[in-house]
Swiss-Prot record:
It catalyses: Cleavage of a beta-linked Asp residue from the N-terminus of a polypeptide. One of its GO terms (biological process) is proteolysis. This is Isoaspartyl peptidase/L-asparaginase. It holds the Pfam family Asparaginase_2. InterPro entries: Ntn_hydrolases_N (IPR029055), Peptidase_T2 (IPR000246). Keywords: Autocatalytic cleavage, Hydrolase, Protease.
Length: 329
């Protein structure tokens, strides 16, 4: 079977990440590196962990290095991993002072207690002898200081001028869904949270609402965590595929429902037949994928492109090229 892969770097603006070309280069490089693992015989789980690590190590994304700071100025990260073949979920919630939370989720796959938070996650990090690491970047520290230093009047003026200001960090997450040569699926999601949140807040990234996989399909979500939890988006899409809908139908129905509820979210997905799909209610979805023959992405979708798949996007690009050539004549 031809392996398939899709990754995302969140649902936030391209502008604060270096622009279209920079983000595209970063995502495409990671997709290419992870796909090599799959073509070399690596498992879906191997690919997902590798992809999450690479995305966590990229400071422009809100996971691992470059995670946003909470209200007290500390970084607390969450991550989960799901083996679709075994339908086995594991994760850590609000873990600090490590580099790659996905590694802890991977370790927990083989444990009886597979979801740990706060003090339990800290104990596990020591048990695993993970090096102490500060994931906060100068950019995130400065961002936190500016947000904390603003008085209410200034903050309101900024929000009126640009309604997206102040909410972009809430939509930062990274995720990977992979299908290997044996037809097995895995999904992983990691986040630094929404920024300035109350201490103890739990995101969707370490829940089946935000990350879920079975032998039928796998989904990773991004966006406002509370919206994703309310929709139970990842599990909803996967269950619909299991119940007989194809992946495109399952994603379209789930995103249509999310639009009706005025949510702010996005999702990437794969199924056991190798179909690749995505959906979003947010303006931007920073996703890239490998079809087995080519790398593509969703970076230039419009606000009205709420759901789609690799085949449709390829067709749209072909039509666009033909139209451009026709105009040139």
């Amino acid at each position: 079977m031809t392996p398939k892969l899709i990754i995302h770097g969140g649902a936030s603006s391209l502008d604060d990440k270096g622009g279209l070309a920079t983000v595209r280069q970063s995502l495409h490089q990671i997709v290419a590196a992870v796909y090599e693992t799959l073509t070399a015989g690596g498992s879906a789980m191997d690919a997902v962990v590798q992809g999450c690590e690479l995305l966590e190590n990229e400071p422009r994304f809100n996971a691992g290095t470059g995670s946003v700071l909470q209200s007290d100025g500390q970084v607390r990260m969450s991550a989960s991993l799901m083996d679709g073949d075994r339908q086995n979920f594991s994760g850590v919630i609000n873990v600090s002072r490590i580099k790659n939370p996905i590694q802890m989720a991977q370790f927990l796959q083989g444990q009886t207690d597979r979801i740990l938070s706060d003090y339990g996650a800290a104990d596990l990090a020591r048990e695993m002898q993970l090096p102490i690491y500060d994931p906060a970047t100068d950019f995130r520290i400065q961002e936190w200081m500016e947000e904390r230093g603003e008085d209410v009047r200034k903050k309101m003026a900024r929000l009126i001028a640009d309604p997206t200001v102040g909410i972009e960090a809430r939509k930062g997450t990274i995720g990977v869904v992979a299908l290997d040569a044996n037809g097995k699926i895995a999904a992983g999601t990691s986040t630094g949270g929404k920024g300035l949140e109350r201490i103890g807040r739990v995101s969707d990234s370490a829940m089946p609402a935000g990350n879920y996989a079975t032998r039928f399909a796998g989904v990773s979500c991004t966006g406002v965590g509370e919206d994703i939890i309310n929709e139970c988006l990842a599990a909803k899409v996967v269950i619909r595929v299991k119940d007989g809908q194809n992946l495109a139908q399952a994603m379209a129905k789930s995103i249509t429902e999310a639009l009706e509820n005025n949510t702010d979210l996005g999702a990437i997905a794969l199924d056991h037949q190798g179909h690749i799909a995505w959906g979003k209610t947010c303006p931007v979805l920073l996703a890239a994928y490998h079809t087995g023959t080519a790398i593509g992405d969703t970076l230039e979708l419009t606000d009205g492109d709420h759901y789609g798949n690799a085949s449709i996007l390829k067709l749209q690009k072909t039509v666009k090229k033909i139209q451009t050539k026709t105009r040139g004549k």
